């Protein structure tokens, strides 16, 4: 595990907002296994958590990682939440995206994690990953995710979502699928090589 620069562990925590106290998918070992792996990594350990929207972040997990387990943690939100609902103000669309971006940046000040975004625009609810990919060019999204991985250089990537229809929202499914895309070519991705 000390040669983890090119090795990345992929975990799927499951539904957003409840990673620390929730049941992990079978075979992952959940947060306890993650803590054990981080301990083996020594002083330099980086964990990237990926979700689709600002409100998908698992703040409890980010705090545990950065403040409790001594890891450098980051959250990659595929969107800025422009397509979400706003029950407390008139802002919608890009205005709401600005508010939600600022909320995430303020949360990172508190939990000690870094914040990243892709260029994907939250166009509202979608029923499937295929529907989401009609609005988000797959190559552009992949490039953005790869750029974040190359900059942050995580040893562990945690997905808030599984990448399956069980995630419900199509954008959530895409966030889970982005993890699967990086499993095989990750050594090349981190080196800056490969076709990605």
Predicted regions and their residues:
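Short acidic, glycine-rich surface-loop motifs adjacent to enzyme active sites
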Residues: 152-165
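Active-site rim/loop-helix segments in enzyme catalytic domains that contact anionic ligands
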Residues: 21-151, 173-184, 188
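Active-site cores that bind ATP or allylic diphosphates and position pyrophosphate for catalysis
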Residues: 188-196
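Glycine/threonine-rich flexible loop motifs
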Residues: 164-173
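Bacterial N-terminal signal peptides
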Residues: 4-16
């Amino acid at each position: 595990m000390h040669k983890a620069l090119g090795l990345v562990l992929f975990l799927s925590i499951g539904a957003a907002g409840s990673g620390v106290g929730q049941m992990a998918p079978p075979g992952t070992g959940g947060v306890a296994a993650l803590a054990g792996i981080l301990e083996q990594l020594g002083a330099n350990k980086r964990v990237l958590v990926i979700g689709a929207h600002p409100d998908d972040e698992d703040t409890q997990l980010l705090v545990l990682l950065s403040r409790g387990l001594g890891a450098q943690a980051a959250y990659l939100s595929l969107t800025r939440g422009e397509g979400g609902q706003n029950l407390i103000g008139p802002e919608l669309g890009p205005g709401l995206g600005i508010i939600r971006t600022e909320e995430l940046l303020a949360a990172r000040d508190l939990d000690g994690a870094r914040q990243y975004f892709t260029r994907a625009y939250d166009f509202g609810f979608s029923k499937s990953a295929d529907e989401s990919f009609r609005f988000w060019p797959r190559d552009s999204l992949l490039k953005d995710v790869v750029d974040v991985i190359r900059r942050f250089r995580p040893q562990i990537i945690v997905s808030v979502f599984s990448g399956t229809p069980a995630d419900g929202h199509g954008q959530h499914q895409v966030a889970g699928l982005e993890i699967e895309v990086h499993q095989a070519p990750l050594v090349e991705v981190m080196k800056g090589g490969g076709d990605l």
